[in-house]
Regions:
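Conserved catalytic core of the tyrosine transesterase superfamily
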Residues: 1-304
Length: 304
């Protein structure tokens, strides 16, 4: 039965590290729709009709057909009665990241340090100075930072990042200056945090939600006058992009060094696919200028 096939397919892909929460919901809904139509196999006509009925935009329509196509290919390997729906491919688009300058980061930290105190805890300004500083200096995902527990802070300035994207864990070493700032923050935190062991808490001493972090981050951006004249405002996730871009800007442009540095950075960031790291090459004019210069030298025969 198609619903059972969905469970098998999702179970297999999750065993490989994919979470697929939305995909599981979409495919389960599609399978129920197909069964209600009397289908025992994936049919192109049914897939197209379902995707058209539930999609509000061309992009979501394409995404649902892609999900069904991958599912159908999985089933087709076992039973050729299944049909793989056609889906138009459009070039993948990702919003250009906002790369914060050192001056902007300094203004943001200053703005965070001057946030208005909120009862019952005076921790608000300390929390956001540390959170922004940690994200900017380590490239952690915001979800990884908010999920940090006290026992994830290992000796020698290492963070243990547990079961994050693709269900992987990794160790993230920190710069000594970051370790020092984190220890000072924790000393202040102990006086007001209560019993919860999350590193970052909301003012009521409960684990901080992503929504709360983002809301306060936008307050900080406004106070620091960062990105206010843009149609699309900078995101907290852009701190991760900024970290990766600055690291790559400091890399030597020799081919062997670039390959080594990319692998190291991909591991540090927790990327399951190094292609996600290569994307950072497009992030700043400095990187593109370095790449162009290296390419010209290679063409001219100056690089072996």
């Amino acid at each position: 039965m198609l619903i059972d096939d969905v469970d098998r397919y999702i179970g297999l892909r999750r065993s490989l590290g994919f979470k697929l929460a939305k995909t599981a919901r979409h495919l389960t809904a599609f399978a129920r729709y197909a069964v209600d139509r009397g289908d025992t196999h994936v049919r192109r006509e049914t897939a197209t009709a379902w995707a058209a009925a539930v999609s509000s935009t061309p992009r979501s329509h394409q995404r649902r057909l892609q999900e069904i196509a991958l599912f159908a290919r999985f089933l087709y390997a076992e039973d050729r009665e299944h049909e793989v729906p056609h889906h138009p491919r459009s070039p993948a688009t990702r919003p250009a990241p906002y790369i914060y300058t050192p001056e902007e980061l300094a203004r943001m930290l200053d703005a965070a340090g001057n946030l208005r105190r909120q009862k019952p805890s005076p921790l608000r300004r300390h929390i956001y100075v540390m959170l922004i500083g940690l994200l900017a200096s380590t490239g952690l995902r915001i979800s990884e930072a908010l999920n940090l527990r006290l026992d994830d802070l290992l000796p020698d300035g290492v963070l243990h990042i547990r079961q994050t994207k693709f269900n992987k864990s990794r160790l993230v070493p920190m710069h000594p200056s970051v370790v020092e700032a984190l220890q000072a923050y924790l000393a202040t935190r102990r006086r007001f945090a209560g019993m919860d062991d999350h590193v970052f808490l909301s003012v009521d001493a409960k684990p901080m939600s992503l929504r709360t972090a983002q809301s306060n981050f936008y307050v900080i951006l406004r106070k620091a006058d960062v990105g206010q004249n843009r149609s699309r405002r900078p995101r907290i996730h852009d701190l991760r992009h900024t970290f990766a871009t600055r690291v790559l800007e400091q890399c030597a442009m020799r081919r062997d060094d670039v390959a080594r540095d990319f692998v190291a950075l991909a591991t540090y960031l927790g990327h399951a696919d190094i292609r996600h790291t290569y994307w950072y090459l497009e992030a700043t004019p400095d990187l593109m200028a370095d790449i162009a210069g290296a390419a010209e030298a290679l063409i001219a025969g100056e690089v072996v």
